Amino acid sequence: MPQKFDLIAIGRAAVDLNAVEYNRPLEDTKTFAKFVGGSPANIAIGSAKLGQKVGFIGKVSDDQLGHYVTQYMASVGIDTSNMVKDDTGHKIGLTFTEIISPEESDILMYRNEAADLYLNAHEVSRAYLAQTKMLVISGTGLAQSPSREAILKALLIAKELGVEVIFELDYRPYTWQNAEETSLYYQLVAQKADVIIGTRDEFDVLENHQGRTDQETIATLFQYDANLIVIKSGIQGSNAYTKAGETYHFGVFKTKVLKSFGAGDSFAAGFLYAYQHQLGLETALKYGSAAASIVISQLSSSEAMPNLDQLTAFIEKAEAQEVHQS
């Protein structure tokens, strides 16, 4: 029987309150715009906008903000049947952003007792996971129990079912106790994941070792289940490494940068679309880079996620300009 979903993401769905006023610090900002946030939710939204069939497993607050998140995700085509409402009073995570300049933007997270961290293992459905080709796991969901156990249960079920596991490192220090704890749980998932995606700094967190080279990192991780590792290095672009020994690189597209946050989630959505459609790893890196460039040029992260026509048009225009300039 063919699977219903191209991918299911599990973990954090939250609310972003993005500063509408630019060039000023958060303490001086008075006006914010509300959007859906959280790395797994953003990846799910980006994937759905690209035409993927997407499901989501997570927990949100049973209030107006929780309803807003669920309704928005459903409106872009995501199946929300496995998004659980917290009935114990936990509130959804909030993220405030400031945009001081294109080079200097920051986030302030309120995640104490956040509802997504209270997803329980019994709320993860084997029958639901059996309907997907791919499971996207975000590192933040491993930060606390019971979400940690829910994520690990989903991982084990996916491996048993032959579902491809994508581990997006998504390191956020706010909810972790210490570096050793983070590295321990990151390594547990990384050793079972088929594809691992993160920044160079996030891989240092995974290994709890600063200053490692990409070659040292992949030599360690390819001893386990991973067959593809994607390491992002900011303006230097990104590299995809295969267990077979192939290396692919793509740089970054020039764009008018408004903010620095949101790039990683859009990169993952674009990359995974091309990867799952077998367009080649160089094209996957290109799609990821283009999606990231589109999102960092706009105020929102989730609502700025491009559809496939917008993504390919951006790439065609950028490549045409590059040829013209050369």
Swiss-Prot record:
Pfam families the record matches: PfkB
SUPFAM superfamilies on file: Ribokinase-like
Pathway this chain belongs to: Polyol metabolism; myo-inositol degradation into acetyl-CoA; acetyl-CoA from myo-inositol: step 5/7
CDD domains documented for this protein: KdgK (cd01166)
Keyword list, A-Z: ATP-binding, Kinase, Nucleotide-binding, Transferase
EC number: 2.7.1.92
InterPro entries, per database record: Carboh/pur_kinase_PfkB_CS (IPR002173), DKG_kinase_firmi (IPR022841), Myo_inos_IolC (IPR030830), Myo_inos_IolC-like_sf (IPR023314), PfkB_Carbo_kinase (IPR050306), PfkB_dom (IPR011611), Ribokinase-like (IPR029056)
Catalytic reaction annotation: 5-dehydro-2-deoxy-D-gluconate + ATP = 6-phospho-5-dehydro-2-deoxy-D-gluconate + ADP + H(+)
Highest taxon of source: Bacteria
Function: Catalyzes the phosphorylation of 5-dehydro-2-deoxy-D-gluconate (2-deoxy-5-keto-D-gluconate or DKG) to 6-phospho-5-dehydro-2-deoxy-D-gluconate (DKGP).
NCBIfam families: myo_inos_iolC_N
PANTHER family xref list: 5-DEHYDRO-2-DEOXYGLUCONOKINASE (PTHR43085:SF49), HEXOKINASE FAMILY MEMBER (PTHR43085)
Family: Belongs to the carbohydrate kinase PfkB family.
Name under which the protein is recorded: 5-dehydro-2-deoxygluconokinase
Organism: Lacticaseibacillus casei
Lineage: Bacteria, Bacillati, Bacillota, Bacilli, Lactobacillales
